[in-house]
Amino acid sequence: MELNTITPGQGAKHAKRRVGRGIGSGLGKTAGRGHKGQKSRSGGYHKVGFEGGQMPMQRRLPKRGFKSHLLKFNAEVTLTALEQLGLAEVDLLTLKQSGLVGQIAKNVKIINTGSLSLAVKLTGISATAGAKTIIEAAGGSIA
């Protein structure tokens, strides 16, 4: 078998249905759209979520909660990611350069996911209580 001899399986490819090309085709004249009405017109059909004039569902239900714009400035880094980084001293700049956090991140928190056997000194980075105990047990520190 060669790459230039491979063909699609039988019935895998379908010819595009051509509509509006004469009565002999079976889909001529109205082209499967029926007679008259909004759906038969070009560009004519309701927008998504329109319910025929009745109050739509997304307006009947109450608003709930909000999305904080501050979330994009806060980032989380796992202990496993910190281990894979393999650095003795870690700060916000090194995390940005390594690509672990985005460039717009202002605050970073180390979370207790995974394990850490490397002694890491963190500067300007916070950690959860569980992550803090693991970092200190491995010989690291948080400043």
Swiss-Prot record:
One of its GO terms (cellular component) is cytosolic large ribosomal subunit. The lineage of its organism: Bacteria, Pseudomonadati, Pseudomonadota, Betaproteobacteria, Burkholderiales. SUPFAM superfamilies: Ribosomal proteins L15p and L18e (SSF52080). NCBIfam families: rplO_bact. Binds to the 23S rRNA. Gene3D superfamilies: 3.100.10.10. Residues 1-59 are annotated as: Disordered. Part of the 50S ribosomal subunit. GO terms for biological process: translation. This is Large ribosomal subunit protein uL15. GO terms for molecular function: rRNA binding; structural constituent of ribosome. The gene is rplO. PANTHER family: 50S RIBOSOMAL PROTEIN L15, LARGE RIBOSOMAL SUBUNIT PROTEIN UL15M. Belongs to the universal ribosomal protein uL15 family. Residues 21-31 have a biased composition (Gly residues). Keywords: Ribonucleoprotein, Ribosomal protein, RNA-binding, rRNA-binding.
